């Protein structure tokens, strides 16, 4: 249904919640940037109101029957009509709440983490810009509006990743993220263009309807679905566009929590879910997506097994879990994919924010060094990070256990068992690399007595040691830990909320395979046990089985040489082709044109040189001949 915003408090709340962060961004950049504390207050207040609006909308419309829309004319050209506005349904209400909630907690945490940073006000301005773009994208009624704010999310992410722009590595990481996600966005745009030209409409509800099959052939739907999925691959770091995400750790740690939990990188998965019925109309495309998600999940898991950087471990785990979400959706398990996105938002934000406390206190990203300097002495962060790692590993009764089991159940419904076995292998690897990190901090080989904050921060330019703000950073951890503990028990209400109104979303199937639950948990516990043997028990070498195999360790540490392949491709194919093209153009067109003009001028001069013989009689004859011709022209 369509309503006017001033008559409907629902749409008023939607507009207020989405637009306030933009107002905050403008106020900070134009007026309050010289006043850091005031800027932070404005930003936190704005996102607080956004969270209140999102929660009120979710509660008010928990039993929503039909999507609520408010639209106005945006683009009108001939038969083309593109509206701009808001659409509220079960999926957008849930995602809006997640984005607002994580944004609020990250901004509160940042009051302690970023205190004293020279770019404090600028940081909160970019946080507000990001929140506005993400929330407005979430409730977009058309894919064109979705795409516009999708690009704004990418721009805001670039600003946040490259926040420490004076550092070369941070600047390069921001550019890499921006360029690699643009590659996927080009395919996304071409896919939307294909739908628009053949279907004539980019309204999300219309794209998800059965009518599209009458206007587009199966081949066209498959092609457009694959192209649109390019955007998912770029934003959600799916193979082969996955290597930018670990480098995005160059931004401040709270930024990592924001990007990796429920916002930028989850935007791709959200888009997959947003037009899930459209994608489902092409079984071929869904099989391709399933393969991409599986490859991504396994590759990222292996990369996480050898790194010593605490933020990179969780970055690789993000890529892997996004692969799990894509697998769930591509297997037809609409609810399982969204449920894992929801639970992942909580425990992944918790993992990064806990890591930020360790980095803040010890000035290093190396988790072996954190353990060596007494990381287990920080009681709240160590308890919370262990809890979140257990949720990431899929251990009961934490939220990650329930959502992973839903995905495994969906994979078990597929006729080919290879997808399920790949998922189970991923569960084992996830538990192993997660507790490799936990045990390295809890049970270091040696301990140095170091007072908190004694180290100079050399990780990502984050030298902010303000012990008095410890509890400002700790409260968001406690809230997220509570969410991680209880969220899984709300699986049934959430499933009724989402799937009860979503056609074709069945098939998560977790309850039909009791044996699968035991196998999955058993494999996760096996991963924890292996990590304990290698890193936790007394006298452990703290060298993993992969690290003992030097060629394999190098392969994983070099990220399967994917970046090297891209560099070779750029240097020898792209640069080579264009270099030869421009060289040939320079030599044959530009040089040839100039040289040809010179030769023509010289040749013409030689041809006319007989006119300048140097004889007076000849010159007089030519002069009189010209005068005679002029006279004939004028008089006759």
Regions found by a protein language model. Give the residues of each.
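N-terminal signal-anchor/start-transfer transmembrane helix
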Residues: 17-32, 104, 233
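Hard-cation-handling environments
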Residues: 463-530
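Hydrophobic transmembrane alpha-helices and their helix-loop junctions in integral membrane proteins
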Residues: 105-146, 155-465, 489
């Amino acid at each position: 249904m369509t309503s006017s915003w001033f008559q409907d408090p629902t749409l008023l709340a939607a507009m207020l919640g989405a637009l306030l962060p933009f107002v905050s961004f403008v106020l900070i950049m134009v007026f309050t940037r010289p006043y850091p504390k005031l800027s932070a207050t404005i930003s936190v207040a704005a996102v607080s109101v956004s969270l209140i609006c999102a929660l009120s909308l979710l509660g008010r419309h928990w039993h929503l029957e039909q999507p609520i829309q408010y639209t106005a004319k945006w683009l009108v050209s001939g038969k083309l009509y593109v509206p701009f506005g808001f659409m509220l349904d079960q999926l957008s209400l849930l995602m809006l709440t997640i984005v607002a909630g994580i944004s609020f907690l990250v901004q509160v945490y940042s009051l302690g983490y970023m205190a004293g940073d020279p770019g404090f006000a600028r940081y909160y301005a970019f946080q507000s810009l990001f929140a506005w773009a993400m929330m407005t994208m979430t409730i977009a009624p058309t894919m064109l509006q979705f795409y516009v704010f999708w690009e704004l999310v990418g721009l805001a992410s670039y600003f946040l990743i490259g926040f420490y722009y004076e550092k070369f590595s941070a600047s390069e990481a921001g550019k890499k993220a921006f360029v690699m996600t643009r590659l996927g966005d080009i395919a996304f745009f071409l896919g939307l263009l294909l739908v628009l030209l053949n279907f004539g409409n980019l309204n999300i509800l219309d794209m998800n309807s059965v009518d599209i099959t009458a206007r587009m052939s199966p081949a066209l739907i498959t092609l457009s679905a694959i192209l649109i999925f390019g955007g998912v691959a770029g934003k959600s770091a799916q193979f082969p566009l996955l290597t930018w995400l670990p480098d995005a750790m160059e931004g401040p740690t709270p930024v990592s929590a924001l990007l990796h939990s429920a916002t930028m990188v989850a935007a791709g998965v959200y888009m997959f879910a947003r037009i899930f019925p459209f994608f489902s109309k092409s079984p071929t495309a869904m099989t391709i997506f399933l393969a991409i998600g599986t490859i991504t999940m396994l590759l990222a898991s292996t990369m996480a097994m050898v790194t010593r950087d605490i933020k990179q471990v969780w970055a690789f785990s993000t890529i892997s879990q996004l692969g799990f979400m894509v697998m769930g959706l591509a297997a037809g398990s609409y609810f399982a994919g969204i449920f894992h996105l929801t639970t992942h938002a909580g425990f992944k934000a918790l993992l990064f924010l806990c890591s930020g406390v360790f980095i803040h206190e010890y000035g290093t990203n190396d988790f072996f060094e954190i353990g060596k300097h007494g990381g287990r002495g920080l009681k709240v962060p160590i308890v919370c990070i262990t809890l979140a790692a257990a949720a990431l590993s899929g251990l009961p009764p934490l939220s990650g256990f329930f959502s992973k089991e839903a995905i495994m159940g969906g994979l078990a419904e597929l006729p080919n068992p290879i997808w399920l076995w790949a998922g189970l292998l991923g569960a084992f690897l996830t538990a192993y690399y997660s507790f490799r990190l936990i045990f390295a901090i809890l049970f270091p080989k040696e301990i140095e007595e170091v007072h908190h904050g004694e180290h100079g921060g050399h990780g990502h330019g984050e030298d902010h040691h303000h012990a008095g703000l410890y509890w400002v950073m700790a409260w968001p951890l406690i809230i997220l830990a509570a969410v991680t503990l209880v969220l899984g028990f709300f699986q049934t209400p959430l499933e009724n909320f989402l799937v009860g109104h979503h056609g074709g979303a069945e098939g998560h199937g977790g309850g039909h395979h009791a044996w699968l639950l035991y196998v999955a948990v058993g494999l996760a516990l096996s991963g924890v046990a292996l990590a304990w043997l290698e890193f936790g028990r007394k006298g452990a070498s703290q060298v993993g089985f992969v690290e003992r195999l030097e060629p394999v360790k190098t392969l994983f540490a070099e990220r399967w040489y994917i970046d090297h392949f891209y560099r070779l491709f750029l240097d020898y194919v792209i640069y080579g082709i264009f270099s030869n093209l421009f060289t040939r153009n320079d030599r044959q067109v530009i040089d040839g044109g100039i040289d040809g003009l010179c030769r023509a001028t010289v040749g013409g001069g030689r041809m006319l040189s007989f006119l300048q013989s140097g004889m007076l009689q000849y010159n007089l004859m030519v002069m009189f001949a010209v005068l005679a011709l002029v006279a004939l022209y004028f008089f006759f």
